[in-house]
Protein backbone atom coordinates (compact mmCIF):
# COMPACT_ATOMS: atom_id res chain seq x y z
CA UNK A 1 0.00 0.00 0.00
CA UNK A 2 1.38 3.41 -0.98
CA UNK A 3 1.86 6.12 1.60
CA UNK A 4 -0.29 9.16 0.91
CA UNK A 5 1.68 12.39 1.18
CA UNK A 6 0.05 15.82 1.05
CA UNK A 7 1.60 19.25 0.76
CA UNK A 8 -0.54 21.86 2.53
CA UNK A 9 -0.05 25.13 0.65
CA UNK A 10 -1.66 27.40 3.23
CA UNK A 11 -1.87 31.16 3.65
CA UNK A 12 0.33 32.27 6.53
CA UNK A 13 -0.41 35.51 8.37
CA UNK A 14 2.83 36.88 9.78
CA UNK A 15 2.70 37.59 13.50
CA UNK A 16 -0.54 35.64 14.11
CA UNK A 17 0.41 32.21 15.47
CA UNK A 18 -3.13 31.82 16.78
CA UNK A 19 -4.74 32.10 13.34
CA UNK A 20 -2.03 30.05 11.65
CA UNK A 21 -2.36 27.25 14.20
CA UNK A 22 -6.13 27.21 13.75
CA UNK A 23 -5.61 26.76 10.02
CA UNK A 24 -2.99 24.05 10.53
CA UNK A 25 -5.30 22.09 12.84
CA UNK A 26 -8.07 22.36 10.24
CA UNK A 27 -5.78 20.97 7.55
CA UNK A 28 -4.79 18.16 9.89
CA UNK A 29 -8.47 17.25 10.35
CA UNK A 30 -8.98 17.26 6.59
CA UNK A 31 -5.87 15.12 6.13
CA UNK A 32 -7.20 12.58 8.62
CA UNK A 33 -10.55 12.44 6.85
CA UNK A 34 -8.85 11.89 3.50
CA UNK A 35 -6.50 9.16 4.67
CA UNK A 36 -3.30 11.19 4.36
CA UNK A 37 -0.27 9.62 6.02
CA UNK A 38 2.20 12.52 5.86
CA UNK A 39 1.17 16.19 5.81
CA UNK A 40 3.85 18.72 4.91
CA UNK A 41 3.35 22.35 5.92
CA UNK A 42 5.55 25.39 5.17
CA UNK A 43 8.57 26.78 6.95
CA UNK A 44 7.71 28.95 9.99
CA UNK A 45 4.06 28.08 9.43
CA UNK A 46 3.18 29.02 13.01
CA UNK A 47 4.74 32.50 13.45
CA UNK A 48 5.37 33.66 9.87
CA UNK A 49 8.74 34.78 8.56
CA UNK A 50 9.14 38.57 8.23
CA UNK A 51 8.41 39.80 11.74
CA UNK A 52 11.09 42.45 12.24
CA UNK A 53 12.36 42.43 15.80
CA UNK A 54 9.20 40.82 17.12
CA UNK A 55 11.51 37.79 17.24
CA UNK A 56 13.03 39.41 20.34
CA UNK A 57 9.74 39.48 22.30
CA UNK A 58 9.69 36.68 24.86
CA UNK A 59 5.91 36.51 25.24
CA UNK A 60 5.42 36.13 21.49
CA UNK A 61 8.07 33.39 21.25
CA UNK A 62 6.50 31.53 24.17
CA UNK A 63 3.13 31.67 22.42
CA UNK A 64 4.63 30.25 19.22
CA UNK A 65 6.13 27.37 21.19
CA UNK A 66 2.82 26.74 22.97
CA UNK A 67 0.89 26.69 19.69
CA UNK A 68 3.48 24.27 18.34
CA UNK A 69 2.82 22.00 21.32
CA UNK A 70 -0.91 22.11 20.48
CA UNK A 71 -0.17 20.88 16.96
CA UNK A 72 2.06 18.10 18.27
CA UNK A 73 -0.55 17.02 20.83
CA UNK A 74 -3.29 17.02 18.19
CA UNK A 75 -1.52 14.24 16.26
CA UNK A 76 -2.42 11.85 19.09
CA UNK A 77 -5.98 11.83 17.75
CA UNK A 78 -5.02 11.66 14.07
CA UNK A 79 -4.34 7.97 13.69
CA UNK A 80 -1.15 7.31 11.71
CA UNK A 81 -0.87 10.87 10.39
CA UNK A 82 2.60 12.44 10.60
CA UNK A 83 2.55 16.24 10.45
CA UNK A 84 5.70 18.13 9.46
CA UNK A 85 5.60 21.88 10.06
CA UNK A 86 7.90 24.84 10.53
CA UNK A 87 8.11 26.82 13.76
CA UNK A 88 10.60 28.62 15.91
CA UNK A 89 12.42 26.43 18.45
CA UNK A 90 13.85 27.90 21.64
CA UNK A 91 16.58 26.62 23.96
CA UNK A 92 16.49 28.86 27.01
CA UNK A 93 19.56 27.15 28.47
CA UNK A 94 21.74 28.53 25.68
CA UNK A 95 22.28 31.93 24.13
CA UNK A 96 22.32 33.36 20.64
CA UNK A 97 25.32 35.45 19.72
CA UNK A 98 23.30 38.57 20.62
CA UNK A 99 22.97 37.34 24.23
CA UNK A 100 19.28 36.46 23.93
CA UNK A 101 17.77 32.99 24.31
CA UNK A 102 18.86 30.54 21.60
CA UNK A 103 16.37 30.41 18.71
CA UNK A 104 16.31 28.05 15.75
CA UNK A 105 14.37 28.10 12.51
CA UNK A 106 13.20 24.52 12.80
CA UNK A 107 11.10 21.76 11.28
CA UNK A 108 9.04 19.54 13.59
CA UNK A 109 7.72 16.09 12.68
CA UNK A 110 4.90 14.91 14.97
CA UNK A 111 3.06 11.59 15.07
CA UNK A 112 0.97 9.90 17.78
CA UNK A 113 1.36 13.00 19.97
CA UNK A 114 5.17 12.81 19.96
CA UNK A 115 8.03 14.25 17.97
CA UNK A 116 10.09 12.12 15.61
CA UNK A 117 13.85 12.60 15.47
CA UNK A 118 16.73 11.53 13.26
CA UNK A 119 18.93 11.01 16.34
CA UNK A 120 21.78 13.32 15.32
CA UNK A 121 21.03 16.38 17.46
CA UNK A 122 20.39 17.02 21.14
CA UNK A 123 16.97 18.25 19.99
CA UNK A 124 13.85 16.59 18.67
CA UNK A 125 13.56 18.88 15.65
CA UNK A 126 15.46 19.62 12.44
CA UNK A 127 17.58 22.80 12.45
CA UNK A 128 17.92 24.97 9.36
CA UNK A 129 21.48 24.99 8.08
CA UNK A 130 21.72 27.83 5.54
CA UNK A 131 20.60 31.13 7.06
CA UNK A 132 20.27 33.62 4.19
CA UNK A 133 21.67 37.10 4.67
CA UNK A 134 20.98 38.85 1.40
CA UNK A 135 18.18 40.95 -0.07
CA UNK A 136 15.29 41.01 2.41
CA UNK A 137 16.62 38.08 4.45
CA UNK A 138 18.30 38.66 7.79
CA UNK A 139 18.19 35.23 9.41
CA UNK A 140 21.48 35.43 11.32
CA UNK A 141 20.08 38.41 13.23
CA UNK A 142 17.64 36.12 15.04
CA UNK A 143 18.43 32.44 14.47
CA UNK A 144 21.24 30.03 15.30
CA UNK A 145 22.10 27.79 12.38
CA UNK A 146 23.12 24.16 12.09
CA UNK A 147 26.66 25.10 11.08
CA UNK A 148 27.08 27.09 14.29
CA UNK A 149 25.55 24.26 16.30
CA UNK A 150 27.89 21.71 14.71
CA UNK A 151 30.89 23.83 15.70
CA UNK A 152 29.56 24.06 19.25
CA UNK A 153 29.02 20.28 19.39
CA UNK A 154 32.45 19.65 17.83
CA UNK A 155 30.87 17.66 15.00
CA UNK A 156 31.02 17.79 11.21
CA UNK A 157 27.94 19.59 9.94
CA UNK A 158 27.73 17.19 6.99
CA UNK A 159 27.14 14.32 9.41
CA UNK A 160 24.18 16.09 11.00
CA UNK A 161 22.14 16.01 7.78
CA UNK A 162 20.43 12.65 8.25
CA UNK A 163 17.07 11.39 6.98
CA UNK A 164 13.99 11.15 9.17
CA UNK A 165 12.20 7.79 9.14
CA UNK A 166 8.39 7.91 9.05
CA UNK A 167 6.25 4.78 9.33
CA UNK A 168 2.51 4.56 8.76
CA UNK A 169 0.35 1.46 8.24
CA UNK A 170 3.47 -0.69 8.12
CA UNK A 171 4.99 1.33 5.25
CA UNK A 172 8.19 3.29 5.79
CA UNK A 173 9.88 6.19 4.03
CA UNK A 174 13.14 7.95 4.83
CA UNK A 175 12.58 11.67 4.35
CA UNK A 176 15.40 14.07 3.55
CA UNK A 177 13.89 17.06 5.31
CA UNK A 178 15.18 20.54 4.42
CA UNK A 179 14.13 24.08 5.26
CA UNK A 180 13.94 26.43 2.28
CA UNK A 181 17.48 27.82 1.73
CA UNK A 182 19.01 24.40 2.44
CA UNK A 183 17.78 23.40 -1.02
CA UNK A 184 19.24 26.45 -2.80
CA UNK A 185 22.70 24.95 -3.11
CA UNK A 186 24.35 27.14 -5.76
CA UNK A 187 26.23 29.45 -3.40
CA UNK A 188 26.86 27.17 -0.40
CA UNK A 189 29.76 24.79 0.16
CA UNK A 190 27.37 22.14 1.53
CA UNK A 191 25.05 20.39 -0.92
CA UNK A 192 22.34 19.44 1.57
CA UNK A 193 20.09 17.46 -0.85
CA UNK A 194 23.03 15.30 -1.91
CA UNK A 195 24.18 14.76 1.67
CA UNK A 196 20.71 13.58 2.63
CA UNK A 197 20.60 11.22 -0.34
CA UNK A 198 24.05 9.85 0.49
CA UNK A 199 22.88 9.20 4.04
CA UNK A 200 19.92 7.12 2.89
CA UNK A 201 17.09 9.55 2.17
CA UNK A 202 14.51 8.13 -0.24
CA UNK A 203 12.42 11.26 -0.71
CA UNK A 204 13.57 14.87 -0.40
CA UNK A 205 11.13 17.31 1.24
CA UNK A 206 11.75 21.04 1.22
CA UNK A 207 9.41 23.14 3.37
CA UNK A 208 9.70 26.81 2.48
CA UNK A 209 8.48 30.31 3.13
CA UNK A 210 9.73 31.73 -0.15
CA UNK A 211 8.58 35.10 -1.56
CA UNK A 212 7.83 35.69 -5.22
CA UNK A 213 10.00 37.59 -7.66
CA UNK A 214 9.91 37.68 -11.45
CA UNK A 215 11.41 34.51 -12.99
CA UNK A 216 12.11 32.98 -9.56
CA UNK A 217 9.96 29.95 -10.36
CA UNK A 218 12.14 29.15 -13.37
CA UNK A 219 15.25 29.22 -11.21
CA UNK A 220 13.50 27.13 -8.55
CA UNK A 221 12.56 24.47 -11.10
CA UNK A 222 16.11 24.43 -12.42
CA UNK A 223 17.74 24.08 -8.99
CA UNK A 224 15.30 21.65 -7.41
CA UNK A 225 14.90 19.60 -10.58
CA UNK A 226 18.68 19.33 -10.80
CA UNK A 227 18.90 18.37 -7.11
CA UNK A 228 16.35 15.57 -7.57
CA UNK A 229 18.11 14.29 -10.69
CA UNK A 230 21.56 14.43 -9.11
CA UNK A 231 20.35 12.63 -5.99
CA UNK A 232 18.33 10.16 -8.04
CA UNK A 233 15.30 10.49 -5.75
CA UNK A 234 12.05 12.52 -5.92
CA UNK A 235 11.64 15.91 -4.29
CA UNK A 236 8.57 17.64 -2.83
CA UNK A 237 8.62 21.41 -2.42
CA UNK A 238 6.04 22.94 -0.05
CA UNK A 239 5.60 26.71 -0.05
CA UNK A 240 2.98 29.04 1.43
CA UNK A 241 0.84 31.82 0.04
CA UNK A 242 0.05 35.21 1.56
CA UNK A 243 1.87 38.49 2.03
CA UNK A 244 4.48 39.52 4.57
CA UNK A 245 6.44 42.74 4.92
CA UNK A 246 9.55 44.19 6.47
CA UNK A 247 8.10 47.67 6.93
CA UNK A 248 9.32 49.02 3.58
CA UNK A 249 8.60 46.10 1.24
CA UNK A 250 5.42 44.10 0.79
CA UNK A 251 6.35 40.61 -0.40
CA UNK A 252 3.92 38.20 -1.97
CA UNK A 253 4.24 34.45 -1.45
CA UNK A 254 3.05 32.65 -4.55
CA UNK A 255 2.91 29.07 -3.32
CA UNK A 256 3.56 27.08 -6.51
CA UNK A 257 4.36 23.99 -4.42
CA UNK A 258 5.43 21.10 -6.61
CA UNK A 259 6.70 17.56 -6.96
CA UNK A 260 9.75 16.50 -8.99
CA UNK A 261 10.51 12.97 -10.11
CA UNK A 262 13.85 11.28 -9.60
CA UNK A 263 14.74 12.32 -13.14
CA UNK A 264 14.27 15.97 -12.22
CA UNK A 265 11.10 16.47 -14.25
CA UNK A 266 8.23 18.46 -12.77
CA UNK A 267 5.36 16.04 -12.10
CA UNK A 268 2.70 18.33 -10.65
CA UNK A 269 2.39 21.78 -9.10
CA UNK A 270 -0.06 23.81 -7.06
CA UNK A 271 -1.67 27.01 -8.34
CA UNK A 272 -0.20 30.47 -7.90
CA UNK A 273 -1.57 32.57 -5.02
CA UNK A 274 -4.20 30.08 -3.88
CA UNK A 275 -4.45 27.72 -0.94
CA UNK A 276 -4.26 24.15 -2.16
CA UNK A 277 -3.42 20.60 -1.16
CA UNK A 278 -0.98 18.81 -3.43
CA UNK A 279 -1.09 15.01 -3.11
CA UNK A 280 1.33 12.26 -4.05
CA UNK A 281 1.70 8.55 -3.36
CA UNK A 282 4.91 6.92 -2.18
CA UNK A 283 5.56 3.30 -3.17
CA UNK A 284 7.99 2.08 -0.52
CA UNK A 285 8.85 -1.06 -2.50
CA UNK A 286 9.56 0.66 -5.81
CA UNK A 287 11.00 3.72 -4.05
CA UNK A 288 8.97 5.85 -6.43
CA UNK A 289 6.48 8.68 -6.21
CA UNK A 290 3.24 8.93 -8.13
CA UNK A 291 1.03 11.95 -8.71
CA UNK A 292 -2.31 12.26 -10.40
CA UNK A 293 -2.01 16.02 -10.82
CA UNK A 294 -0.99 18.03 -13.83
CA UNK A 295 1.48 20.86 -14.27
CA UNK A 296 0.42 24.44 -14.83
CA UNK A 297 1.08 26.19 -18.11
CA UNK A 298 3.99 28.64 -17.90
CA UNK A 299 2.92 32.24 -17.33
CA UNK A 300 4.25 35.20 -19.26
CA UNK A 301 6.29 37.74 -17.32
CA UNK A 302 3.59 40.41 -17.45
CA UNK A 303 0.97 37.85 -16.38
CA UNK A 304 3.07 37.10 -13.29
CA UNK A 305 3.50 40.82 -12.67
CA UNK A 306 -0.24 41.46 -12.77
CA UNK A 307 -1.23 38.57 -10.51
CA UNK A 308 1.50 39.41 -7.99
CA UNK A 309 0.58 43.09 -7.80
CA UNK A 310 -3.12 42.37 -7.59
CA UNK A 311 -2.70 39.74 -4.90
CA UNK A 312 -0.22 41.84 -2.92
CA UNK A 313 -2.35 45.00 -3.00
CA UNK A 314 -5.55 43.13 -2.21
CA UNK A 315 -4.10 41.29 0.77
CA UNK A 316 -2.39 44.45 2.04
CA UNK A 317 -5.67 46.38 1.95
CA UNK A 318 -7.51 43.53 3.66
CA UNK A 319 -4.95 43.24 6.46
CA UNK A 320 -4.89 47.02 6.95
CA UNK A 321 -8.69 47.24 6.94
CA UNK A 322 -8.72 49.59 3.94
CA UNK A 323 -11.81 49.28 1.75
CA UNK A 324 -11.55 52.44 -0.34
CA UNK A 325 -8.80 54.15 -2.32
CA UNK A 326 -8.35 57.68 -3.62
CA UNK A 327 -6.01 58.24 -6.57
CA UNK A 328 -4.77 61.38 -8.26
CA UNK A 329 -5.47 60.84 -11.97
CA UNK A 330 -3.23 62.99 -14.16
CA UNK A 331 -3.96 61.60 -17.61
CA UNK A 332 -0.62 59.77 -17.66
CA UNK A 333 0.10 56.04 -17.74
CA UNK A 334 1.26 55.63 -14.11
CA UNK A 335 -1.86 56.96 -12.39
CA UNK A 336 -4.13 55.29 -14.95
CA UNK A 337 -2.61 51.85 -14.37
CA UNK A 338 -2.81 52.38 -10.60
CA UNK A 339 -6.46 53.40 -10.90
CA UNK A 340 -7.33 50.38 -13.06
CA UNK A 341 -5.57 48.05 -10.63
CA UNK A 342 -7.56 49.31 -7.64
CA UNK A 343 -10.85 49.27 -9.54
CA UNK A 344 -10.06 45.65 -10.40
CA UNK A 345 -9.44 44.91 -6.71
CA UNK A 346 -12.05 47.03 -4.91
CA UNK A 347 -14.70 47.64 -7.54
CA UNK A 348 -15.50 51.04 -9.09
CA UNK A 349 -17.73 52.28 -6.25
CA UNK A 350 -14.84 52.10 -3.79
CA UNK A 351 -12.36 54.09 -5.88
CA UNK A 352 -12.32 57.89 -6.09
CA UNK A 353 -10.29 59.45 -8.91
CA UNK A 354 -9.42 63.13 -8.92
CA UNK A 355 -7.89 65.25 -11.67
CA UNK A 356 -6.15 68.38 -10.37
CA UNK A 357 -5.30 70.62 -13.30
CA UNK A 358 -3.17 73.73 -13.15
CA UNK A 359 -2.64 76.27 -15.91
CA UNK A 360 0.07 73.96 -17.30
CA UNK A 361 -2.14 70.91 -17.80
CA UNK A 362 -3.25 70.39 -21.37
CA UNK A 363 -6.84 69.75 -22.45
CA UNK A 364 -5.55 66.45 -23.85
CA UNK A 365 -4.43 64.98 -20.50
CA UNK A 366 -7.54 66.29 -18.77
CA UNK A 367 -9.69 64.57 -21.39
CA UNK A 368 -7.71 61.33 -21.06
CA UNK A 369 -8.18 61.40 -17.28
CA UNK A 370 -11.95 61.82 -17.60
CA UNK A 371 -12.18 59.11 -20.28
CA UNK A 372 -10.22 56.72 -18.04
CA UNK A 373 -12.49 57.35 -15.05
CA UNK A 374 -15.58 56.95 -17.22
CA UNK A 375 -14.33 53.69 -18.76
CA UNK A 376 -13.50 52.29 -15.33
CA UNK A 377 -16.86 53.41 -13.92
CA UNK A 378 -15.15 54.90 -10.88
CA UNK A 379 -16.08 57.97 -8.86
CA UNK A 380 -14.52 61.07 -10.41
CA UNK A 381 -14.04 64.73 -9.64
CA UNK A 382 -11.97 67.67 -10.84
CA UNK A 383 -10.34 70.07 -8.37
CA UNK A 384 -8.21 72.78 -10.02
CA UNK A 385 -5.12 73.89 -8.09
CA UNK A 386 -4.05 77.09 -9.86
CA UNK A 387 -5.63 79.47 -7.35
CA UNK A 388 -4.49 77.55 -4.27
CA UNK A 389 -0.91 77.32 -5.57
CA UNK A 390 -0.85 81.02 -6.39
CA UNK A 391 -2.20 81.76 -2.92
CA UNK A 392 0.55 79.63 -1.35
CA UNK A 393 3.17 81.35 -3.49
CA UNK A 394 1.87 84.79 -2.56
CA UNK A 395 1.87 83.93 1.14
CA UNK A 396 5.46 82.71 0.95
CA UNK A 397 6.76 85.69 -1.01
CA UNK A 398 4.71 88.52 0.47
CA UNK A 399 4.84 87.62 4.16
CA UNK A 400 7.79 89.39 5.79
CA UNK A 401 10.30 87.35 7.76
CA UNK A 402 12.02 89.06 10.67
CA UNK A 403 15.64 88.37 11.58
CA UNK A 404 16.15 88.90 15.30
CA UNK A 405 19.89 88.58 14.74
CA UNK A 406 20.16 91.25 12.02
CA UNK A 407 17.18 93.32 13.23
CA UNK A 408 15.58 93.53 9.81
CA UNK A 409 12.75 92.13 7.70
CA UNK A 410 13.20 90.33 4.41
CA UNK A 411 11.09 88.36 1.94
CA UNK A 412 11.58 85.12 0.06
CA UNK A 413 11.45 84.48 -3.66
CA UNK A 414 9.94 81.47 -5.39
CA UNK A 415 11.96 79.91 -8.21
CA UNK A 416 10.28 77.99 -11.05
CA UNK A 417 11.45 74.70 -9.51
CA UNK A 418 10.01 75.62 -6.12
CA UNK A 419 6.70 76.47 -7.78
CA UNK A 420 6.69 73.05 -9.46
CA UNK A 421 7.05 71.43 -6.04
CA UNK A 422 4.31 73.64 -4.59
CA UNK A 423 1.94 72.22 -7.21
CA UNK A 424 2.90 68.64 -6.40
CA UNK A 425 2.49 69.16 -2.65
CA UNK A 426 -0.82 70.91 -3.13
CA UNK A 427 -2.10 67.92 -5.08
CA UNK A 428 -0.78 65.25 -2.73
CA UNK A 429 -0.84 66.68 0.78
CA UNK A 430 -3.92 68.89 0.43
CA UNK A 431 -6.29 67.57 -2.21
CA UNK A 432 -5.67 63.82 -2.44
CA UNK A 433 -4.99 63.35 1.28
CA UNK A 434 -8.05 65.43 2.17
CA UNK A 435 -10.31 63.58 -0.26
CA UNK A 436 -9.05 60.22 1.02
CA UNK A 437 -9.89 61.19 4.59
CA UNK A 438 -13.37 62.36 3.59
CA UNK A 439 -14.06 59.45 1.22
CA UNK A 440 -12.68 56.92 3.69
CA UNK A 441 -9.76 54.57 3.22
CA UNK A 442 -6.37 55.62 1.92
CA UNK A 443 -4.56 56.98 -1.12
CA UNK A 444 -1.79 55.56 -3.27
CA UNK A 445 1.65 56.64 -4.40
CA UNK A 446 1.81 56.41 -8.20
CA UNK A 447 5.61 56.58 -8.58
CA UNK A 448 7.29 53.94 -10.73
CA UNK A 449 10.74 52.46 -10.19
CA UNK A 450 12.42 54.60 -12.85
CA UNK A 451 11.21 57.80 -11.17
CA UNK A 452 12.21 56.56 -7.72
CA UNK A 453 15.69 55.77 -9.02
CA UNK A 454 16.46 59.39 -9.90
CA UNK A 455 14.20 61.11 -7.39
CA UNK A 456 11.58 62.31 -9.87
CA UNK A 457 9.11 62.87 -7.05
CA UNK A 458 8.38 65.58 -4.51
CA UNK A 459 8.63 65.20 -0.75
CA UNK A 460 5.12 65.25 0.77
CA UNK A 461 3.64 65.58 -2.73
CA UNK A 462 3.53 62.60 -5.05
CA UNK A 463 5.81 60.45 -2.89
CA UNK A 464 3.27 59.86 -0.14
CA UNK A 465 0.40 57.45 0.44
CA UNK A 466 -0.41 54.10 2.04
CA UNK A 467 1.53 52.02 -0.47
CA UNK A 468 3.29 52.24 -3.83
CA UNK A 469 1.74 49.52 -6.02
CA UNK A 470 3.92 50.19 -9.08
CA UNK A 471 7.03 51.30 -7.19
CA UNK A 472 8.89 48.17 -8.31
CA UNK A 473 7.91 48.49 -11.98
CA UNK A 474 10.22 50.07 -14.53
CA UNK A 475 8.46 52.39 -16.95
CA UNK A 476 8.28 49.76 -19.71
CA UNK A 477 6.61 47.39 -17.24
CA UNK A 478 3.96 50.04 -16.54
CA UNK A 479 3.10 50.32 -20.23
CA UNK A 480 3.00 46.52 -20.58
CA UNK A 481 0.75 46.23 -17.55
CA UNK A 482 -1.56 48.87 -19.02
CA UNK A 483 -1.94 46.82 -22.20
CA UNK A 484 -2.51 43.68 -20.13
CA UNK A 485 -5.24 45.36 -18.08
CA UNK A 486 -7.04 46.34 -21.28
CA UNK A 487 -6.60 43.04 -23.12
CA UNK A 488 -6.78 40.39 -20.40
CA UNK A 489 -8.35 41.83 -17.25
CA UNK A 490 -11.08 44.20 -18.39
CA UNK A 491 -11.07 42.84 -21.96
CA UNK A 492 -11.94 46.27 -23.30
CA UNK A 493 -10.24 49.64 -23.75
CA UNK A 494 -10.49 51.06 -20.22
CA UNK A 495 -7.18 52.88 -20.66
CA UNK A 496 -7.49 55.10 -23.76
CA UNK A 497 -5.05 54.46 -26.60
CA UNK A 498 -3.78 58.03 -26.32
CA UNK A 499 -2.36 57.22 -22.89
CA UNK A 500 0.12 54.83 -24.52
CA UNK A 501 1.25 57.24 -27.24
CA UNK A 502 1.30 60.62 -25.50
CA UNK A 503 4.77 61.90 -24.57
CA UNK A 504 5.36 61.64 -20.81
CA UNK A 505 5.38 65.03 -19.10
CA UNK A 506 5.01 66.25 -15.53
CA UNK A 507 3.12 69.33 -16.81
CA UNK A 508 4.42 71.48 -13.96
CA UNK A 509 5.73 74.37 -16.08
CA UNK A 510 5.41 75.90 -19.53
CA UNK A 511 8.49 73.92 -20.57
CA UNK A 512 6.81 70.61 -19.73
CA UNK A 513 4.04 69.90 -22.20
CA UNK A 514 2.68 66.81 -23.90
CA UNK A 515 3.77 68.37 -27.18
CA UNK A 516 7.40 68.89 -26.27
CA UNK A 517 7.61 66.22 -23.59
CA UNK A 518 9.95 67.81 -21.11
CA UNK A 519 10.94 64.37 -19.80
CA UNK A 520 14.71 63.89 -20.24
CA UNK A 521 14.54 60.13 -19.74
CA UNK A 522 14.88 57.85 -22.76
CA UNK A 523 13.00 54.97 -21.15
CA UNK A 524 14.05 52.14 -23.52
CA UNK A 525 17.66 52.95 -22.55
CA UNK A 526 17.48 54.42 -19.05
CA UNK A 527 15.20 51.65 -17.72
CA UNK A 528 17.88 49.12 -18.65
CA UNK A 529 20.73 51.32 -17.39
CA UNK A 530 19.14 51.87 -13.98
CA UNK A 531 18.19 48.22 -13.76
CA UNK A 532 21.86 47.25 -14.21
CA UNK A 533 22.79 49.51 -11.28
CA UNK A 534 20.21 47.88 -9.03
CA UNK A 535 19.10 44.39 -10.03
CA UNK A 536 22.21 42.67 -11.38
CA UNK A 537 23.64 40.38 -8.72
CA UNK A 538 27.10 41.82 -9.36
CA UNK A 539 26.01 45.43 -9.43
CA UNK A 540 27.34 47.54 -12.25
CA UNK A 541 28.78 51.01 -11.74
CA UNK A 542 29.76 53.81 -14.13
CA UNK A 543 33.04 51.91 -14.60
CA UNK A 544 31.39 48.94 -16.31
CA UNK A 545 29.01 51.18 -18.26
CA UNK A 546 31.85 53.29 -19.65
CA UNK A 547 33.95 50.21 -20.40
CA UNK A 548 31.12 48.54 -22.32
CA UNK A 549 30.41 51.79 -24.15
CA UNK A 550 34.05 52.07 -25.22
CA UNK A 551 34.01 48.43 -26.40
CA UNK A 552 30.74 48.86 -28.29
CA UNK A 553 29.01 46.16 -26.21
CA UNK A 554 26.82 48.32 -23.96
CA UNK A 555 23.54 47.53 -25.72
CA UNK A 556 24.29 43.81 -25.50
CA UNK A 557 25.06 43.98 -21.78
CA UNK A 558 22.01 46.11 -20.96
CA UNK A 559 19.62 44.29 -23.28
CA UNK A 560 18.52 47.31 -25.31
CA UNK A 561 18.73 48.31 -28.96
CA UNK A 562 22.08 49.75 -30.06
CA UNK A 563 20.52 52.44 -32.23
CA UNK A 564 18.66 53.86 -29.21
CA UNK A 565 21.99 54.68 -27.58
CA UNK A 566 23.57 56.15 -30.70
CA UNK A 567 20.52 58.28 -31.47
CA UNK A 568 20.27 59.62 -27.91
CA UNK A 569 23.99 60.32 -27.55
CA UNK A 570 25.83 61.28 -30.75
CA UNK A 571 29.25 61.36 -29.09
CA UNK A 572 31.15 60.22 -26.00
CA UNK A 573 30.88 63.62 -24.35
CA UNK A 574 27.08 63.63 -24.39
CA UNK A 575 26.98 60.00 -23.25
CA UNK A 576 29.27 60.69 -20.29
CA UNK A 577 27.36 63.83 -19.32
CA UNK A 578 24.10 61.84 -19.24
CA UNK A 579 25.65 58.99 -17.26
CA UNK A 580 27.11 61.30 -14.63
CA UNK A 581 23.91 63.33 -14.38
CA UNK A 582 21.75 60.33 -13.49
CA UNK A 583 24.38 58.66 -11.28
CA UNK A 584 24.61 61.84 -9.19
CA UNK A 585 20.83 62.20 -8.95
CA UNK A 586 20.46 58.54 -7.98
CA UNK A 587 22.89 58.91 -5.07
CA UNK A 588 21.93 62.28 -3.61
CA UNK A 589 18.45 63.50 -2.64
CA UNK A 590 16.82 60.56 -4.41
CA UNK A 591 18.07 58.30 -1.60
CA UNK A 592 16.25 60.37 1.02
CA UNK A 593 13.10 60.30 -1.09
CA UNK A 594 13.26 56.51 -1.41
CA UNK A 595 13.75 56.19 2.34
CA UNK A 596 10.58 58.22 2.94
CA UNK A 597 8.57 56.51 0.19
CA UNK A 598 5.54 54.36 1.14
CA UNK A 599 5.91 50.56 1.27
CA UNK A 600 6.51 49.07 -2.17
CA UNK A 601 4.85 45.92 -3.48
CA UNK A 602 8.07 44.11 -4.39
CA UNK A 603 8.22 41.78 -7.39
CA UNK A 604 11.67 42.14 -9.01
CA UNK A 605 14.94 40.61 -7.89
CA UNK A 606 15.83 43.87 -6.09
CA UNK A 607 13.29 46.42 -4.89
CA UNK A 608 13.91 49.74 -3.20
CA UNK A 609 13.26 49.69 0.52
CA UNK A 610 14.73 47.08 2.84
CA UNK A 611 15.45 44.77 -0.08
CA UNK A 612 18.03 47.20 -1.49
CA UNK A 613 19.55 48.77 1.60
CA UNK A 614 20.91 52.29 1.21
CA UNK A 615 22.89 54.80 3.20
CA UNK A 616 22.77 58.53 2.49
CA UNK A 617 26.23 59.19 1.09
CA UNK A 618 27.73 61.33 -1.66
CA UNK A 619 28.13 60.15 -5.28
CA UNK A 620 31.41 58.37 -5.94
CA UNK A 621 33.18 57.64 -9.21
CA UNK A 622 35.99 55.03 -8.91
CA UNK A 623 39.49 55.79 -10.17
CA UNK A 624 39.06 53.47 -13.14
CA UNK A 625 36.08 55.53 -14.25
CA UNK A 626 38.15 58.71 -14.39
CA UNK A 627 40.82 56.89 -16.42
CA UNK A 628 38.27 55.56 -18.92
CA UNK A 629 36.58 58.95 -19.14
CA UNK A 630 39.84 60.74 -19.91
CA UNK A 631 40.72 58.12 -22.51
CA UNK A 632 37.35 58.46 -24.27
CA UNK A 633 37.34 62.25 -24.27
CA UNK A 634 40.92 62.47 -25.53
CA UNK A 635 40.50 59.99 -28.39
Where are these regions (language model features)?
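Enzyme catalytic cores with a strong preference for nitrogen-chemistry domains
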Residues: 1-328, 339-350, 355, 375, ...
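ATP/NTP-dependent adenylation/nucleotidyl-transfer catalytic domains that generate, transfer
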Residues: 3, 173, 232-233, 244, ...
Amino acid sequence: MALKIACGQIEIIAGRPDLNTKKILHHMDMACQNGIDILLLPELAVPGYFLGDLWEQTAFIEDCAAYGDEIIAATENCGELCVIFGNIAVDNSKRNEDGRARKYNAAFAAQHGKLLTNGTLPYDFIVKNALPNYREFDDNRHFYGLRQLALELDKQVSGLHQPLTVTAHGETVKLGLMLCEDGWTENYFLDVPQLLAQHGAELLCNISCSPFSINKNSKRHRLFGSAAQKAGIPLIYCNNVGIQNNGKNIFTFDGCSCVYGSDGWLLTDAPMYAEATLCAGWDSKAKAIDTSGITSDPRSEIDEVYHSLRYGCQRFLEQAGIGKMTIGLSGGIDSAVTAALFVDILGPDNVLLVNMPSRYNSPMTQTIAEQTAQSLGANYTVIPITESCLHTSEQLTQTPIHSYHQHRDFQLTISPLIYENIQSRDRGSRVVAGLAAAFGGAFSCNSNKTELTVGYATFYGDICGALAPIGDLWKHHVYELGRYLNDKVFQRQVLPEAIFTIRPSAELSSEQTVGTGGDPLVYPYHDKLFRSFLEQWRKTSPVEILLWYSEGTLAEHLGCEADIISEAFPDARSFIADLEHWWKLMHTLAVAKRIQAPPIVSITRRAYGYDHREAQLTPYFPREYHRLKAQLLND
